[in-house]
UniProtKB/Swiss-Prot annotation:
It comes from Homo sapiens. One of its GO terms (biological process) is protein branched polyubiquitination. Component of the anaphase promoting complex/cyclosome (APC/C), a cell cycle-regulated E3 ubiquitin ligase that controls progression through mitosis and the G1 phase of the cell cycle. The APC/C complex acts by mediating ubiquitination and subsequent degradation of target proteins: it mainly mediates the formation of 'Lys-11'-linked polyubiquitin chains and, to a lower extent, the formation of 'Lys-48'- and 'Lys-63'-linked polyubiquitin chains. The APC/C complex catalyzes assembly of branched 'Lys-11'-/'Lys-48'-linked branched ubiquitin chains on target proteins. Residues 998-1007 have a biased composition (Polar residues). Transmembrane segments: none annotated. The modification Phosphotyrosine is found at residue 571. Keywords: Cell cycle, Cell division, Dwarfism, Ectodermal dysplasia, Hypotrichosis, Mitosis, Phosphoprotein, Repeat, Ubl conjugation pathway. The gene is ANAPC1. InterPro entries: Apc1 (IPR024990), Apc1_3rd (IPR048971), APC1_C (IPR041221), Apc1_MidN (IPR046794), Apc1_N (IPR049255), ARM-like (IPR011989). Pathway: Protein modification; protein ubiquitination. This is Anaphase-promoting complex subunit 1. It comes from the Eukaryota. The modification Phosphothreonine is found at residues 291, 537. The mammalian APC/C is composed at least of 14 distinct subunits ANAPC1, ANAPC2, CDC27/APC3, ANAPC4, ANAPC5, CDC16/APC6, ANAPC7, CDC23/APC8, ANAPC10, ANAPC11, CDC26/APC12, ANAPC13, ANAPC15 and ANAPC16 that assemble into a complex of at least 19 chains with a combined molecular mass of around 1.2 MDa; APC/C interacts with FZR1 and FBXO5.
């Protein structure tokens, strides 16, 4: 019988049995695919998947060939999660035919298809692989780089890779692949051996057989191998041995296992990157070209890749080589090679040449692996075979270049060769497993020998290599690792499933529902029908444990049978099984702790192997015990426990602890059946006595024992404590005391058990676990369970101080007397007392208390990896209270002692990585240091909440400190810990990719549908309504800028007008109004700049340009197309272009846009082509055009549509600003004849496209001072007209464009133009500006300019009218901000009448502007400075425009003077606009506003005709633009009024150009809806000069002086500068007060300014810091002296700055003056604070739901609950305190303290932990470090109420003193003198001892208390015990023999 019993008990029950069918199989049938039709035709499904017993085809991963019927295969892995997320589900990759199906489980839902792929040819293999995207190719870089997770699908000729992000790659394979493996670095390929390569006698050198590919875009390179030889030297060579097959590859550690088919041995190699010296060896070696003999000396591994040598190739075209690559090899080899290789088309060969990761010369890897007997090294071919292929520049590769190998394998271990090595003993399955103590084994299954070979390996001490140990053989038919619990499942030949840990056998696995095969062979007994028949009773558990010893053998092979017989008997056993029915055929797909079993009938089941322990307490204790025991014993201990725990019908969660205690104590030698507190353990955890297992009955008649048993059961305790029982007043039926004396005689320990010698060590680590659990408030129940075990052990080990320690913690649980088990004194010698064992119990509370009191403490012992909280608490107290900063950077031994028995390298290493202190974050104070350090070690708010409140207090205090003034650059985790959600959300948003904005405005649908879309619906109205809250100016702007509605044509019909004439009159009026309508889109583009995130599936809406009108009173339509009046041709073409630009500029730069979407927006109708051209230009300006495919750009340009070319060229140039991008340069050069070689074909490029291309060159080369470009552009400014009418019209705009482009190329370089001195740039420009003789054209374009134009007779002088503007602005830009006086003097306005007559007045504007821009620092924002630019002669003689009579003087030309005057003033104003652009400078605004008003007055003056209205309008427009630049984005009301006034003027001189200027001014004023402003960087000024060029077009098609498209370049000067505070709780924009600090400059000192956000910030380079000011919001500081990157990223993401409202405060919207805030109210009635506070008002000042509910339920009286008013008042005042001091997290601490004091008053303290916490709180507030902090920060808010703590202290003192007076003194005396105590007094005594820090009685006798006569003597004696005086005062009466206690 016993035999059978043991067989049963060592069974391990598997759980969760489920039938398994691969998910992909089912999905395949429904997946749309031609192949699943074939699947249906093959056979019925049931037949299809069944297989005969031996073959096991299901899921086989053998090579699939096309001729066989379709096979399936699949693999499973653990679900891959995000960092920090714990997942427990499977992912499956299923392959059948051409399909690959990837499915995933999830925590919450069923398995679902994640991705399915269908490829063109049958899939040979599919696998997961992570590629590393790294610039740095070193080994170290691997940890930090981003990983691209891919799925790879191998077909016969190529491999497809699909990344999770959706990128697809395809790589053609240059050889037939036998197998592909994922590695840590990428993919590893094994080449198939072609038939002729196998004979070893072949004289030709073999090719490499293994190759690697590190990224889908990298090349396939050969693998190198480094094998150590006998003499210590090692060789490096290619892997060429065909006999060497990879059988296993692992990523961590990165090792490869190979099998040598010739020698029949397995070897292990480490896989790593090639070192550079190894590269050189291989490459040099291969270039020497040695003969095969001297190569063959180094074993069979020598190998070199071949490639075609030049002489071989009869083919001249480089591309033919690729397709006919094998044609040469036919001569040297059998044709079969050719037939086996995949044929690869030219396109495939070339496809990888375009990949960005490759050089110019690598077309494909294909030709390089070809065979040729000439050359020894892999070479790359040059592209051309001509003799001078390398002479024509560096564009081509050097003639041959070897392939550089990337990975290398290093030999680690080879199995020893035995004599009887069988053929084909290749491992069929290999895996790595570790045992329960973390020792690692590499296991490989040799199926032919039915053996599992396990090799132990470990890392060397320096972590550089792996050391392999001995091999252990386990007989096995199949095996699989169970990673989760560090074990492996082995299927024995007999069909048994056995669990091993490492090589130690744990036990058989019992699978419910499957017959156990072992019964037929080992037992003749019939098996019970159900597995749960024989439930073991509690009594024989110790027997059960004893019997385990015999079964758990350390030897892996059962000694019951002879191993030789084992092999013989296998087959006949199998026969017996088949008669029995199904048996297990194989094991596969292990994930976590789940495996699939394949059964003999073809079905599969998936089972779960139970975990080692489910309850946290048992897990922690097991970890601690495992940590302290020697490895062998630890494994045995865990195996025993696992067998008990996992037996069929194992324990429930509740009773697991009881089982653990029993098991552990039995292993220590206890007889748990005889021990009072363990004998009645309930192993079921049930509440019903019926189900509770009874003891085995000794007799039929029954006895009193049954009743005793019931009374002692847990069930009885449960019932007894039940409320019903109390209410019925049933007297407790006591169990008759288990006659203790019966037991106590013979309760001794059995010293022969496994753990007997280790009892002290186990006791000590369990004590440390106990102290650790005290730091987790959620583990209270576990502590009570653990303390019972510890007390028993402490008593038996006679450790008095420990028993006393537990008594003080749990006075009711720990009786001072109890059952003691004797340990034979003879045996105690065998006990191992470890060195770390201390006689004084380590106490974490005591340690913290001593630190707070400033006493020295010994280091606290801790278990690495187990007692992490203790470690954290100790170090944080040391840092914050003791102020020791060194410990965060290094492990400090002065506070902690790490307990070790063996050097556990692994754990230590992990720790040091975890606790490293990252110095990236800026910290100043100790509090900040503590918080940042705690975050770095992974401490979170949740951890803080589970710490007891007294221990957590110092940490909370530090957090409170940091919360006040945190740094803005702290990482998200720190901000979360200190409770600043505003900052953590900011940090979190900061990490997000630029996606849809936070403040995206959801436009309510239906608002715009009935009316036409005006292109302005997508603005963020929420923010705009905050910026301009007082009025409706935004609606007004929208009305002024809309062009989608018909205009009102108001014409009065005079009597003399006929109807026909009246219609003409109306249409003429409409034509006038249309000039204005066509000018609106430019301004609208400015207003809506970057305000919209398009939906990628919808086209961009472009509003209509409506040129019709409505005439009142009947609203009749007026149309220009009626034919009554002449309308200019192409009138609307540029207006449409601007409309397209405006629509495109709405798109924000952060939008998700791709090439397809851009093409998708292309209109169907030709008339919309102009709009699309504008749209393309806009996409360039916001940076999206770079995504447009080159092919599409080419398509658009070849269409020859002029506008599209202009838009595209300007767009791509703006997108590539300043990059000197070669491809764009080529694109532009085609359109600029001057950049083409002189002999090239003359292309017919439209003039405007040339202008756009020239400006484009300027943009692409901006600021580069590129000599050739500058030279060409300089010449182009003065390019003369040609003979055949080319370059004869609109020359001015081309010359200007060349000047602007030259200025951009040399932007701000001034006189530092390196290498251009011979060009004389400034002199040449000066000549262009003032005129003179034309210089002779030099260089290659000389020919072009020989014959002059036949139309334009300029002679050989420069036409200044053409060249002056461009040259002037070029000078301005080259010398921008250089303050170069000499150049500026060239630009001074002429000061004599004679000279004035030589200069067009318009050019004086440009000269003045240029001069001021050069003398940047001299510009002053006042009218005096503006006037100072006007020469004296003009100032003195200029007429005042308001005068009636004109002074007459013959010499002076009044017209010239007055025109010169206004233009110079306008030029100075414009420069003022540039200087203060976007600054909202008040002086500049006032000055410019005054001049604008003046010009408006001049216009209506009687003698305006002298100056000319057109000139005055121009100057007014220029001044208005300057004003708008200064106030850009601010929406200033006065400027808006000016713009609105000018909008209404439509007649007379008001042409298209002036309207354009006025509406651009309006757009600038509301730039980007108030979110953008202008920058004054050099680049911005260049862009603004192009956009605001002060010569406006006369009509809508006028591009003579300036190309209209350039007006949109202002975008390059716009930058986001709006800061929008967003309330983090409501997520809505709000007002907040900012304090902005300006850096000091030469004009002003460092100053501070207060702004109410949302507001536009000044330019960031002017600022020092920005601060969100209190008191309403939490303060927040952004320090710009550390760099502006942080703020720039905030501004670019819509400027969202999260802010958090402080408690008791209302937002500025609700309470503008701050009179309603809570603090304002309390100041008014300060005297009755707590009473004045009504709980109802709390909702006004906090949004925390927990606080609101607290106020609702705890602070208001409720019916029938009878709470005392006193408690309600207390709660209300505490709540008020917490909320006003911003410490809501302290509320639980306040309440816990109050509850503890009340419990103490009722004398119901069953445990003293809360009293400890109160004691720690009081000690913290009286600690020295805290007092110092208060002195340093007197203004700091109080962290805990100063009135609350003294009351607490006083109440406790009173309660304990009262207890002393009513008999407590006798109790204390009895305790100190070691006499027995009264049961009822135990808990109060413990409270007294803890609170007053009374030492244990063991410490008292040496002092001799009784002899003391005076208090002074006592004081002296107690000094060394560090006992507080207040405690001594209470003890003195007892010790001095005075009965009256002294109460103070």
């Amino acid at each position: 019988m016993s035999n059978f019993y043991e067989e049963r008990t060592t069974m391990i029950a598997a759980r969760d049995l489920q039938e398994f069918v691969p998910f992909g199989r089912d999905h395949c049938k429904h997946h749309p695919n031609a192949l699943n039709l074939q699947l249906r035709q093959l056979q019925p499904a049931s037949e299809l998947w069944s297989s005969d017993g031996a073959a096991g085809l299901v899921g086989s991963l053998q090579e699939v060939t096309i001729h066989e019927k379709q096979k399936e295969s699949w693999q499973l892995r653990k679900g891959v999660s995000e960092i920090g997320e714990d997942v427990d589900y499977d992912e499956e990759l299923y392959v059948a035919g051409n399909m690959v199906i990837w499915s995933k489980g999830s925590k919450s839902q069923a398995l679902a298809v994640y991705k399915a792929f269908t490829v063109d040819s049958p899939v040979q293999q599919a696998l997961w692989c992570d590629f590393i995207i790294s610039q740095d190719k070193s080994e170290k870089a691997y940890s930090s780089n981003e990983v691209e997770k891919c799925i790879c699908i191998l077909q016969s000729s190529c491999i497809n890779m699909h990344s999770i992000e959706g990128k697809d790659y395809i790589a053609s394979l240059p050889f037939q692949v036998a197998n592909v493996w994922p590695t840590k670095y990428g993919l590893l390929f094994e080449r198939s051996a072609s038939s002729h390569e196998v004979p070893p006698g072949s004289p030709r050198e073999p090719l490499p057989t293994m190759f690697s590919m590190l990224h889908p875009l990298d090349e396939i390179t050969p693998l190198v191998c480094k094998s150590g030889s006998l003499f210590g030297s090692s060789r490096v060579q290619y892997v060429v041995d065909h006999a060497m097959k990879i059988v296993f590859l692992n990523t961590d550690p990165s090792i490869v296992m190979t099998y040598d088919a010739v020698q029949n041995v397995h070897s292990v190699w480490t896989l790593r990157r090639v070192k550079s010296e190894e590269e050189n060896v291989v490459l040099k070696f291969s270039e020497q070209g040695g003969t095969p003999q001297n190569v063959a000396t180094s074993s069979s591994l020598t190998a070199h890749l071949r490639s075609l040598s030049k002489g071989d190739s009869p083919v001249t075209s480089p591309f033919q080589n690729y397709s006919s690559i094998h044609s040469q090899s036919r001569s040297t080899s059998s044709p079969s090679l050719h037939s086996r290789s995949p044929s690869i088309s030219n396109m495939a060969a070339l496809s990888r040449a375009h990949s960005p990761a490759l050089g110019v010369h690598s077309f494909s890897g294909v030709q390089r692996f070809n065979i040729s007997s000439h050359n020894q090294s892999p070479k790359r071919h040059s592209i051309s075979h001509s003799p001078n292929s390398n002479s024509n520049g560096s564009f081509l590769a050097p003639e041959t270049e070897p392939i550089v190998p990337e990975l290398c394998i290093d030999h680690l271990w080879t199995e020893t060769i035995t004599n009887i090595r069988e053929k084909n003993s290749q491992a069929s399955k290999v895996f790595i497993t570790s045992d329960l103590c973390g020792q690692k084994f590499l296991c490989f299954l040799v199926e032919s020998q039915l053996q599992l070979r396990c090799v132990k390996f470990q890392e060397s001490n320096d972590k550089t290599q792996l050391i392999f140990g001995s091999v252990t053989n386990i007989p096995a038919k199949d095996a699989a690792p169970v990673e989760k619990i560090d074990t492996m499942l082995v299927l024995e030949g007999s069909g048994n499933l056995v669990l091993y840990t490492g090589v130690v056998r744990v036990g058989k696995v019992f699978i419910p529902g499957l017959p156990a095969p072992s019964l037929t062979m080992s037992n003749t007994m019939p098996r019970p029908s159900t597995p749960l028949d024989g439930v073991s009773t509690p009594k024989p558990l110790s027997k059960l444990l004893g019997s385990l010893d015999e079964v758990v053998l350390l030897s892996p092979v059962p000694e019951l049978r002879d191993s030789s017989k084992l092999h013989d008997s296998l087959y006949n056993e199998d026969c017996t099984f088949q008669q029995l029915g199904t048996y297990i055929h194989s094991i596969r797909d292990p994930v976590h702790n789940r495996v699939t079993l394949e059964l003999s009938n073809g079905s599969m089941v998936r089972i779960t192997i139970p975990e080692i322990a489910t309850s946290e307490l048992v897990q922690t204790c097991l970890q601690a015990i495992k940590f302290i025991l020697p490895k062998e014993i630890a494994v045995q201990m865990l195996v025993k426990w696992y067998n008990v725990h996992s037996a069929p019908g194992g324990p429930s969660y509740h009773s697991e602890w009881n089982l653990f205690v029993t098991c552990l104590m039995n292993m220590m030698g206890y007889n748990t059946d005889r021990l009072a507190w363990t004998r009645n353990f309930d192993f079921e955890g049930s509440l019903s006595p019926v189900i509770a297992p009874k003891k085995a009955r000794p007799s039929e008649t029954g006895s009193d024992d049954d009743w005793e048993y019931l009374l002692n059961s847990d069930y009885h305790q449960n019932v007894e404590s039940h409320l019903l029982n109390r209410s019925l007043c049933l007297s407790p039926s006591e169990a008759s005391q288990m006659k203790d004396e019966d037991f106590s005689q013979n309760l001794s320990l059995d010293s022969s058990t496994l753990l007997f010698t280790h009892i002290p060590a186990i006791f000590f680590v369990l004590h440390l676990v106990y102290e650790e659990l005290k730091l987790n408030t959620l583990m209270g129940e576990g502590i009570c369970s653990l303390v019972e075990l510890l007390v028993q052990l402490a008593r038996d080990l006679k450790l008095g101080p420990y028993v006393d320690h537990y008594y003080r913690d749990y006075p009711t649980l720990v009786r001072t007397t109890g059952q003691v088990c004797t340990i034979d004194p003879g045996q105690t010698g065998f006990m191992h007392h470890p060195s770390f064992f201390t006689s004084e119990p380590p106490s974490i509370y005591q340690w913290v208390s001593s630190c707070l009191k400033g006493e020295g403490m010994p280091p606290y012992p801790y278990l690495p990896g187990i007692c992490e909280r203790s470690r954290l608490v100790v170090l944080s107290i040391a840092l914050y209270i003791l102020g020791d900063e060194s410990l965060v950077s290094d492990e400090s031994s002065q506070y902690l002692t790490r307990i070790t028995i063996a050097p556990q390298k692994l754990q230590v290493e992990q720790e040091e990585n975890r606790f490293s202190f990252r110095h990236s974050t800026s910290v100043s104070s100790l509090a900040e240091r503590l918080v940042v350090w705690m975050t770095n070690v992974g401490f979170t708010l949740r951890d803080l909440e589970t710490l007891p409140f007294g221990i957590a207090l110092p940490i909370r205090d530090a957090i409170y400190h940091c919360r006040e003034q945190p740094a803005s650059d702290w990482p998200e985790a720190v901000c979360l810990l200190i409770g600043r959600q505003d900052l953590s959300k900011q940090a979190c948003e900061g990490n997000l990719p630029k996606g849809k904005s936070v403040l995206s405005s959801d436009v309510p649908s239906g608002t715009e549908t009935e009316e036409e879309d005006d292109g302005m619906n997508d603005m963020n109205h929420e923010v705009m309504s905050l910026i301009w809250s007082e009025d409706l100016r935004v609606q007004d702007v929208r009305r002024l800028l809309q062009s989608a509605h018909p205009v009102r044509v108001n014409v009065v019909q005079y009597p003399e007008l006929s109807d026909h004439e009246f219609i003409e009159e109306k249409e003429n009026r409409l034509l006038q109004l249309c000039q204005r309508t066509m000018a609106l889109p430019v301004g609208r583009g400015m207003f809506t700049l970057f305000s919209y995130h398009p939906v990628p599936t919808e086209p961009l809406p472009i509003p209509k340009l409506n040129l019709t009108g409505r005439a009142p009173p009947r609203n009749t339509t007026v149309d220009l197309n009626s034919g009554n009046i002449d309308v200019p041709p192409n009138m609307t073409s540029w207006a449409s272009f601007h409309n397209g630009v405006a629509a495109g500029l709405k798109i924000a730069p952060a939008s998700q846009i791709d090439s397809a979407w851009i093409v998708y927006n292309k209109p169907k109708h030709a008339e919309l082509a102009n709009e699309y051209a504008g749209f393309l230009m806009a996409l360039g300006l916001n940076g999206h055009l770079t995504k447009l495919a080159t092919l599409n750009i080419h398509d658009y340009l070849t269409k020859g549509h002029e506008m599209t070319s202009i838009g595209l060229l300007l767009g791509v140039s703006a997108a590539k600003l300043g990059t000197m991008d070669m491809s764009i340069t080529r694109l532009l050069s085609i359109h600029i004849p001057a950049l083409l070689p002189p002999t090239s074909t003359e292309l017919d490029v439209p003039h405007n496209v040339q202008v756009a291309a020239v400006v484009g060159i300027g943009l692409v080369y901006q600021g580069t001072a590129h000599r050739h470009t500058a030279e060409v552009l300089l010449a182009e400014i003065g390019r003369p007209p040609g003979p055949e009418m080319e370059y004869c019209t609109d020359r001015e705009s081309y010359s200007l464009a060349a000047g602007l482009a030259l200025g951009m190329v040399c932007l701000g370089h001034g006189s530092n133009l390196i290498g251009m001195s011979d060009l004389n740039v400034p002199e040449q420009l000066y000549q262009y500006m003032v005129g003179g003789h034309r210089r002779f054209q030099t260089g290659m374009h000389r020919e072009k300019h020989k014959s002059p134009s036949y139309q334009i007779k300029e002679g050989d002088t420069i036409n200044v009218d053409v060249t002056c503007p461009g040259a002037t602005l070029a000078l301005a830009m080259i010398y921008l901000k250089t303050n170069n006086r000499s150049i500026a003097d060239w630009l001074r306005a002429p000061d004599t009448m004679y000279l004035l007559d030589f200069v067009k007045p318009e050019f004086l504007l440009l000269r003045t502007l240029a001069r001021c821009l050069i003398l940047w620092d001299d510009i002053l924002p006042n009218s005096k400075w503006v006037d100072s630019n006007v020469p004296q002669i003009i100032r003195e003689n200029s007429i005042s425009l308001s005068e009636i009579e004109l002074p007459c003087s013959e010499d002076l030309n009044l017209e010239t003077l007055s025109q010169a005057h206004v233009y110079i003033i306008a030029g100075a104003c414009l420069s003022l606009g540039f200087r203060f652009a976007g600054s909202e400078n008040l002086s500049a605004f006032n000055c410019l506003h005054k001049f604008a008003k003046d010009f408006m007055t001049y216009l209506s003056a009687p003698n305006a005709s002298v100056t000319g209205p057109h000139n005055l309008e121009t100057c007014l427009s220029v001044v208005l633009l300057s004003l708008a630049m200064v106030m850009a984005g601010s929406g200033n009301l006065k400027v808006l009024q000016l713009c609105r006034f000018l909008h209404m003027k439509t007649g007379g001189e008001m042409n298209y150009g002036f309207h354009l200027a006025h509406h651009m001014a309006l757009g600038l004023l509301f730039l980007g809806g108030g979110r953008y402003s202008l920058s004054t960087s050099n680049s911005s000024i260049a862009a603004l000069l192009c956009a605001l060029y002060p010569h406006f077009p006369a009509h809508s098609t006028d591009n003579r002086y300036h190309l209209q498209a350039l007006r949109h370049l202002y975008v390059l000067a716009a930058e986001p500068r709006l800061l929008v505070p967003v309330d983090v709780d409501t997520n809505t924009p709000c007002y907040a007060l900012l304090e902005v600090t300006y850096k000091g400059t030469q004009w002003y000192e460092q100053t501070k300014e207060e702004l109410m956000a949302p507001t536009l910030l000044p330019e960031l380079h002017l600022l020092k810091q920005i601060k969100v000011k209190g008191p309403r919001y939490w303060e927040l500081l952004i320090d710009l002296s550390k760099g502006t990157q942080h703020l720039k990223s905030i501004l670019s993401k819509d400027g969202v700055l999260y802010v958090k409202l402080r408690a008791g405060q209302l937002s500025y919207k609700e309470d503008p003056m701050g009179w309603q805030s809570l603090l304002a109210q309390t100041v008014a009635n300060r005297n009755s604070e707590a009473r004045a506070f009504k709980p109802e008002t709390i909702s006004a000042f906090t949004s925390d739901p927990a606080l609101l509910s607290f106020a609702e339920y705890f602070c208001k009286p409720t019916v029938n609950m009878g709470q005392k008013q006193e408690i309600l008042d207390l709660f209300s005042s505490v709540l008020y305190e917490c909320v006003t001091q911003e410490t809501p997290e302290m509320l639980p601490a306040y309440i816990a303290m109050d509850q503890a004091i009340r419990r103490l008053g009722r004398r119901e303290m069953s445990e003293t932990s809360e009293l400890w916490q109160i004691k720690l709180v009081l000690e913290f507030f009286s600690s020295r470090s805290h007092q110092e902090r208060l002195q340093n920060h007197p203004k700091r808010g109080l962290f805990m109420n100063s009135e609350f703590l003294p009351v607490v202290k006083c109440t406790i003192d009173n309660t304990l003193d009262q207890w002393l007076q009513v008999g407590g003194d006798m109790c204390v005396h009895a305790y100190l003198s070691g006499q027995p105590l009264e049961e009822s007094q135990l808990s109060m005594l413990a409270c007294f001892l803890v609170y007053h820090s009374v030492p244990a009685p063991q410490h008292l006798p040496p002092i001799g208390l009784e002899g003391s006569t005076s208090f002074a003597e006592l004081l002296f004696k107690f000094k060394q015990l560090k006992m507080p005086v207040r405690a001594l005062l209470r003890l003195a009466p007892l010790l001095l023999g005075n009965p009256q206690p002294m109460v103070m």
